[in-house]
Amino acid sequence: VSYTYYSLRHLPYTVLMDITVTAKKDITITGASVMEAPDALRDVQNYYNEIDRPHVVISLLTSSAKSPTGKLLMCASNTFLFSEHHGQEPRVIHEMWDNNMHLMKFSRKIRAGETYRYTIAGSSITSAHHDDPLNEAERATIFAKLEGRERLINFHTKAWDELWKSDIQIDGDAQSQQDIHSMMYHLYSFTREGTALSPSPMGLSGLGYNGHVFWDTDLWMFPAVLVLNPAIA
């Protein structure tokens, strides 16, 4: 079993996850997308909708909740992208486990030696970013479903190719080159053109900084971005 995550560069607030399973013997797998709200959040609401059209069926798993202070409304939505043709996809079932937890799942038989891949697309947004975060999260997820996996990854890759046109190249020191590219990748991962948000000091590694911005950003991060990608700066 392998997983690949794509934080889609061309679609803010949207992520794509590939799950690939290779069977060593005949098996039946059950794949599930579980959405659980942390206990600290308030007024959790869970939604499940199926959009059935002649060309597509979309299973939409959505949750919303208020921040601990009640100031912000936070919303998330996701859907499956199957590799089968329309009309041949596995049946999706919705289950409600608790007030703050629900899931959608499917089952599929896989023969020995067969490799099966399915994908989950999801979006998360708050009222700090949009006046109607619930509909915006669902809209972004529906758009990702309609685009399809291949187009999403293609446009994601093209967006990163544009960023890498501005580069730092080091001759004769492969390790330093790799280190610099790693730093650039992580810096770009937490910044975006068209937003006033500052890069997080700890990225996605934890909640300890709670959104605070420190001198690290101005002293170390901003100058490099200003030189490499002024539009982002």
Q: Whereabouts are the PLM-identified features?
A:
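Acidic/polar, glycine-enriched structural segments that form the non-catalytic walls/loops
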Residues: 1-209
